[in-house]
Regions:
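Short beta-strands and strand-coil junctions in structured, solvent-facing domains, enriched
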Residues: 48, 58, 85-87, 124-125, ...
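Cell wall/extracellular polymer interaction/catalysis modules
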Residues: 21-76, 81, 97, 106
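Short, solvent-exposed aromatic-acidic interface loops
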Residues: 63-67, 85, 121-123
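Exported/periplasmic cell-wall-interacting domains
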Residues: 30-35, 92-175
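Short, charged beta-turn/beta-strand-edge "cap" motif at the junction between a beta-strand
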Residues: 55, 85, 161-164
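Short, solvent-exposed loop/turn elements at domain surfaces
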Residues: 49-51, 72, 86-91, 118
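N-terminal secretory targeting signals
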Residues: 1-37, 165-175
């Protein structure tokens, strides 16, 4: 049986504890004043997607949302992947990237499994409750948004407009 030097073990534990404290302290300093992060807020009833940086509006887009039989989930999620020219997979088969693809030219997957922000092969659906729960966008809008967000971007899907979002949307209408 190997003997353990209690004194050196205690010193090692103390050094590790101090190092852990210093790392946590440094992390707190680094994140005390984080840069304004971009976030997406979708008003499902208004069928609008707002891209914000802090409380500053960067863009407002018209979108399609889930129909009543397949509603858009509500809550706070994050973008977990970004896929240019996605392949659409369904029980009936796959659709390669292109004009017939129901996902359009871009896919931004959400932390709500199976849901995302994507394009459409039915542009007339924008502004309507027409999807299977995802948020659909016009091709040009989608491609612009895709370049402005990253994996980790916060996405809030609201079933009822918040005070902030109501104010933003009413100001956008009056401009």
């Amino acid at each position: 049986m190997k003997s353990v030097n209690l004194k050196s073990t205690t010193k090692l534990m103390a050094v590790l504890a101090i190092a852990a404290f210093e790392v946590r302290g440094e992390e707190a300093i680094r994140t005390a004043n984080p840069p304004e992060r971009r976030r997406i807020v979708v008003s499902v009833p208004d069928r609008k997607l707002v891209l914000l940086e802090g409380d500053r509006v960067l863009r407002i887009y018209d979108v399609a949302v889930g129909k009543s039989s397949t509603p858009t989930p509500q809550g706070k999620f994050t973008i977990i992947n970004r896929v240019p020219n996605p392949t659409y997979y369904a029980s009936s088969g796959t659709v390669a990237p292109g004009t017939n693809n129901p996902l359009g030219s871009r896919w931004m997957g959400l932390s709500a499994k199976g849901y995302g922000i994507h394009g459409t092969n039915v542009p007339s659906s924008i502004g309507k409750a027409a999807s299977h729960g995802c948020v659909r966008m016009r091709k040009q809008d989608l491609e612009e948004l895709f370049e402005m967000v990253t994996v980790g971007t916060s996405v809030e899907l609201q079933g009822e407009p918040s005070e902030l979002l109501s104010k933003i949307l009413s100001e956008a209408v009056s401009e």
